[in-house]
Regions:
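Conserved SAM-binding loop
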Residues: 14, 96, 114-117, 149, ...
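N-terminal helical cap/lid subdomain that shapes the substrate entry/recognition surface
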Residues: 2-101, 105-110
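Short, flexible loop segments at the rims of nucleotide/cofactor-binding pockets, characterized by
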Residues: 90-95, 119, 187-188
């Protein structure tokens, strides 16, 4: 089936928000002489229903100092607030990753509809799209607020395809995380894997195409993804 629409992930695909998200938690862990390892963080990438970094911190502290663990557990709201401040400070100067703007402009010129399907909440995604002045490129923006379960479940991509009034097989998904790639495949969408700074350190599952950057591809080649032999 010919590709008729593009569905973009957000975090790590359009903007490298995953680096400050991880780094901000690592900074909080350092406050308690703890280490947050990438292999522990990995299940959280591309979803909102995996790893709880605060609960993990309490668990690690309990092995060393049960009393301190109790205090940290009780201070959850304060710790999350500090982490949010750090995350926003680290994210302040971020922009679109290479190739994103060009692909959006090409899709608009061709009349190809685009959507965003993200496991983050709506205020986060819409805030970024507005700040980066790209919201108008998207016919639909689907977030964790729109589904009962996020990636790796297929719900976000199925809903995005429905909002675009297209079958999933006609919607090409652009994803950076293993959870997102699994979700796209479960939805029946063709998927291009574009690992980011953080997800590039993880094993990436099979996809229809693997890229190091969206700057390495153009819209014409994406549209013919399922028919051009050089994509195999």
């Amino acid at each position: 089936m010919e590709i008729a629409a593009l569905i973009f992930d957000f975090d790590g695909l359009m903007v490298d928000t995953e680096s400050p998200t991880l780094t901000s938690w690592q900074m909080v862990y350092t406050d308690y002489a703890l280490e947050l390892r990438l292999e522990d963080w990995a299940p959280a990438l591309g979803t909102n229903n995996g790893f709880d970094p605060h609960a993990h911190m309490v668990k690690l502290l309990n092995e060393r100092d049960p009393y301190q663990a109790v205090l940290v557990a009780a201070a959850r709201d304060e710790i999350l607030a500090r982490r949010d401040v750090l995350k926003h400070e680290l994210s302040a100067d971020l922009g679109l990753l290479p190739g994103v703007a060009e692909l959006l402009e090409a899709a608009a010129a061709e009349g190809m509809p685009c959507a965003v399907a993200s496991s983050s909440n709506r205020s986060w995604v819409e805030g970024w799209l507005g700040r980066l002045a790209v919201r108008h490129y998207f016919r639909a923006v689907l977030t964790a607020d729109d589904v009962r379960v996020t990636k790796p479940a297929p719900d976000l991509f199925l809903l995005a395809a429905a909002r675009l009034d297209l079958p999933p097989a006609a919607c090409l998904v652009l994803e950076d995380s293993p959870n997102g790639i699994h979700a796209a495949r479960a939805a029946g969408c063709p998927v291009v894997a574009v690992p980011g700074v953080v997800t590039g350190q993880l094993p990436i599952p099979p996809a229809d195409l693997h890229l190091t950057s969206l700057a390495d591809i153009d819209l014409l080649r994406l549209r013919t993804l399922r028919t051009k032999a050089w994509f195999q």
